[in-house]
Each structure stands twice: as C-alpha cells, then as structure tokens.
Amino acid sequence: MYDYIKGTVTTITPEYIVVEAGQIGYQIITGNPFSFQRLEGTEAQVFLYQHVREDNISLFGFQTTEERYLFKKLLSVSGIGPKSALAIIASGDVVPLISAIESEDDVYLTKFPSVGKKTARQIILDLKGKLADVVASEIVYVAPENDMVAGLSPQLEEAVLALEALGYSTRELKKVIPKLSKEEDLTSDAYIKLALQLMTK
C-alpha cells in the first residue's frame, strides 16, 4: 500500500498525471489533473490510494490527505465507485460537500456526476456524523456575532462555530453545549465528534 509519492510531474492529461520517481513514471488518476499544471516539471508530493481489481491496479492521487480521507469514505457508500468518488472530490471544495451531507441536502449532492436521488440519500445515511476529521481541518473559523459561544473554552468555541458553519441550527447547538461543556480538556476535533454523536442519537 502506497501512502504518497514524491517526484517530478512530467505529464498532465485530462484524466491523469505522470509522476517520475526513481526513473519510473507512475500514472496517477486525479479528479482534476490540470490543478497540477503549476507543478509540471517540478517535484511534487501526491497522496495516493491504490485500487486493486482482478484485471487492473490503479493509483488515485490527491493534493491533500483530507481529500483522500473523504474519497475513502465515499468509497464505503453503496453504489459509489472510485470514478464517482473522484468526480465528487473534483469539485475542489470539501466544506460545501460535507455541509450538504450534514444538513441532508440531497438536492446539492445530485449535482455531481452519477449521483441520483437514491445514491444521494445513501451518502447521507452512511456518512452523516462521520466526517468530523475533515471538518476540523478544513473549516475556517470566524469570530462569533452572537453570545452562543460566550464563556466557552477556545477548543469548544471552535467546534461550535464549525458545526454552525455546517448548517446546524442555534437551537440544536444550544441543546448539546451544556453536555459538551462538562467534558474538559478535549480538542476541537473531539468536541465535534462528540457533538455529532449527541445530535444523531
């Protein structure tokens, strides 16, 4: 199993890039190969996912570990294959995607190739509440304009603002904040996970 490759980006096509490392050219399928254009001819690090079938071994490439994590989560959904998962990731911004999953916005999800109403509902069913790791690393936190987070620890404040950005209502958050406040010394990521568990019970 490969984790990443470091080498020179030598070729960019509409479907894949080629990275040369150790005098071997690796063909790597990516959601948006042309996003690597600025790296052509230079050394780049590409995070990998190796997909093995009876008749084929493919390498899928990502610019961040968060993209790869989400790709693997999408693969766990019934009806989503590697190419469909990659097409979803290729939108380039994972935050609206995660927000749609958390808010059960199946209309937003059906805009992606090969995702119909049934598949969109399956994505929500399988992944809602399970993407806190990506949320914690991708969301840019904004200073609050209300008193909902007043008096909270910095870690809990970050978690609450992240959940608010994902579309959770003030009412939903106020229900779980007292329970979260009882848990001390948690990271923002841990608070997000706990909050999602409480709200999905």
Swiss-Prot record:
Residues 64-142 are annotated as: Domain II. Residues 143-153 are annotated as: Flexible linker. Gene3D superfamilies: 5' to 3' exonuclease, C-terminal subdomain, DNA helicase RuvA subunit, C-terminal domain, Nucleic acid-binding proteins. Keywords: Cytoplasm, DNA damage, DNA recombination, DNA repair, DNA-binding. Its main location: cytoplasm. One of its GO terms (biological process) is DNA recombination. It comes from the Bacteria. The keyword Transmembrane helix does not apply. It holds the Pfam family RuvA_N. It is found in: Cytoplasm. GO terms for cellular component: cytoplasm; Holliday junction helicase complex; Holliday junction resolvase complex. InterPro entries: DNA_helicase_Holl-junc_RuvA_I, Hlx-hairpin-Hlx_DNA-bd_motif, NA-bd_OB-fold, RuvA, RuvA_2-like, RuvA_C, RuvA_C_sf. GO terms for molecular function: ATP binding; four-way junction DNA binding; four-way junction helicase activity. The keyword Nuclease does not apply. Residues 153-201 are annotated as: Domain III. Residues 1-63 are annotated as: Domain I. Belongs to the RuvA family. NCBIfam families: ruvA (TIGR00084). The RuvA-RuvB-RuvC complex processes Holliday junction (HJ) DNA during genetic recombination and DNA repair, while the RuvA-RuvB complex plays an important role in the rescue of blocked DNA replication forks via replication fork reversal (RFR). RuvA specifically binds to HJ cruciform DNA, conferring on it an open structure. The RuvB hexamer acts as an ATP-dependent pump, pulling dsDNA into and through the RuvAB complex. HJ branch migration allows RuvC to scan DNA until it finds its consensus sequence, where it cleaves and resolves the cruciform DNA. Homotetramer. Forms an RuvA(8)-RuvB(12)-Holliday junction (HJ) complex. HJ DNA is sandwiched between 2 RuvA tetramers; dsDNA enters through RuvA and exits via RuvB. An RuvB hexamer assembles on each DNA strand where it exits the tetramer. Each RuvB hexamer is contacted by two RuvA subunits (via domain III) on 2 adjacent RuvB subunits; this complex drives branch migration. In the full resolvosome a probable DNA-RuvA(4)-RuvB(12)-RuvC(2) complex forms which resolves the HJ. Has three domains with a flexible linker between the domains II and III and assumes an 'L' shape. Domain III is highly mobile and contacts RuvB. This is Holliday junction branch migration complex subunit RuvA. It comes from Listeria monocytogenes serotype 4b (strain CLIP80459).
